[in-house]
Amino acid sequence: IRKMKNKKGFTLVELIVVLVILAILAALLVPALTGYIDKANYEKVVATTRSVVMAAQTEYSEAYGKGTAVALAATAEANTTDIGKAACKLAEITDSADKYINDIKSVKLTGTATDGVITKVEVTQGKYICVYEKNGLTSTTDYKYTSGNYGVKAAS
């Protein structure tokens, strides 16, 4: 009996109980963490789009002031037009060869030459597409996440 009392440490049952409790806690935390990860990814593409919107509006306003603004249609990639290339460089989303970086697959700008305003920007980054609409999103039901004039949906 004395030998049993002098033994220190945990019994096998105590260790198993602790492991079961840790497994239950981990199972409860995993769904919450994936929600945070998704929200962080949404915010990342929104931040990229905000940067593109600011850069595009800066370049477009400058062209409008010089009288060289042309209508931008969302059918062409931004890195193929002069204003788009300048905006992409300013937003730091292209390399020196005008190729997209940081998992950006597509950037499309829409602007009106009559008033020099960028009206719509669409950025595809990773698995998500973020859309900016100057006058607010026309429909918020299409998006998994919205923030002001920005909406994020899954890329197809």
Describe every region a protein language model picked out.
Residues 7-34:
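N-terminal single-pass transmembrane signal-anchor helix
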